[in-house]
């Protein structure tokens, strides 16, 4: 099983889109942890409504403490052999989990990282795609943390939401 941790803070309508992209995954053995970080716009209520429709979704709530605290709370409650993150304004391609899992199993990697499309609105409100690196497997045979630190030093921009650990 893969645990997907999604921090939620005042996500509004974006939350539904993000959750639907997770539910459409070709690999269905996952749990989705929606961690509400003290939203004030009804996002927590929406998270609970979404959880009623699919038993793979669990909702955790905490007072507003920031995205890192929300991710850490999710880590404390995840049950999967693997875990990944998906932010509340992200969408996952339908084969994202399957692709990462196949790469991890076929290489024996400790961490796999996927490619991504980063879209930002320009001044005119039009989506602009920014450059992104391809996916890769990270095989660590060094003491815990040492190999990953070396990987981070050799890589470009780092995000937690395009990797599976």
Q: How would you describe each model-predicted region?
A:
Residues 1-165:
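Nucleotide-sugar donor-binding/catalytic module of glycosyltransferases
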């Amino acid at each position: 099983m893969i645990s997907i941790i999604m921090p939620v803070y005042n996500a509004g309508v974006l939350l539904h889109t993000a959750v639907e992209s997770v539910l459409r995954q070709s690999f269905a053995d996952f749990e989705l942890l929606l961690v509400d970080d003290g939203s004030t716009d009804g996002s927590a209520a929406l998270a609970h409504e979404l959880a009623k429709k699919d038993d793979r979704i669990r909702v955790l709530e905490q007072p507003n403490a920031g995205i890192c605290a929300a991710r850490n709370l999710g880590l404390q409650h995840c049950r999967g052999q693997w875990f990944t993150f998906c932010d509340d304004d992200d969408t996952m391609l339908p084969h994202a989990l399957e692709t990462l899992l196949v790469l991890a199993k076929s290489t024996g990697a400790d961490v796999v990282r996927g490619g991504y499309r980063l879209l930002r609105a320009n001044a005119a409100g039009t989506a602009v795609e920014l450059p992104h690196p391809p996916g890769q497997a990270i095989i660590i045979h060094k003491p815990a943390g040492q190999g990953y630190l070396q990987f981070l030093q050799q890589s470009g921009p780092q995000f937690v939401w395009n990797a599976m650990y």
